[in-house]
């Protein structure tokens, strides 16, 4: 079971260090059954920590470069300093808020694949697309250019209308989309979108579900630990 936490624009270096200590202690004790590569935490770039033992740290965003004249961006050299080899690509907040194009998403994918990084590739439809019923076409388009056979690929289904709204997709909706995605790739499939303490257990048991990508419910260490307890 893969459990990923997107901390988004939350946590300072000090607060994330405290987060990591609490989580490491939990994972080394009563939750030692979780493997390090099953728990992925994506802090903001300014909070990267080099004192992590029992989980994997990843990057929410990066620019497809080693280094260079790219003001405000972070490249592979910076990620390498912290041993980061897991990245989020294609998140709807990057696409919508920051106007990240399909071309840039593809460039990031190619860059990460070339380096053997573990990629959580996010796909999802808007509420309008969902109501119109053509979400399968939209999801197919989002996946059309990437290598679905890449060995370090994870696909996260995050319907845009469920992200940060407190309104998770219904189990039958999640199950249908995951089945559709499973026909396209053998990559592990995650669900993300208002995952919380009340629904995480049921979601994790759905067919084709290999785990979850959690947003706000994971931002505090105690809350994230309680979510992990639901999966034990």
Swiss-Prot record:
Tell me where it resides. Answer: Cytoplasm
Provide the E.C. number(s) assigned to this enzyme. Answer: 5.3.1.1
Q: Which gene encodes it?
A: tpiA
What species does this protein belong to? Campylobacter hominis (strain ATCC BAA-381 / DSM 21671 / CCUG 45161 / LMG 19568 / NCTC 13146 / CH001A)
One matching Pfam family is: TIM
Q: What is its main location?
A: cytoplasm
Q: What's the stated role of this polypeptide? A: Involved in the gluconeogenesis. Catalyzes stereospecifically the conversion of dihydroxyacetone phosphate (DHAP) to D-glyceraldehyde-3-phosphate (G3P).
List the protein's name: Triosephosphate isomerase
| Enzyme class, UniProt record, top EC level | isomerase
Q: Which reaction does it catalyse?
A: D-glyceraldehyde 3-phosphate = dihydroxyacetone phosphate
Asked if the Swiss-Prot or TrEMBL record annotates the protein with the keyword Isomerase, the reply is: yes
Which residues does the Swiss-Prot or TrEMBL record annotate as the active site? Answer: 91, 158
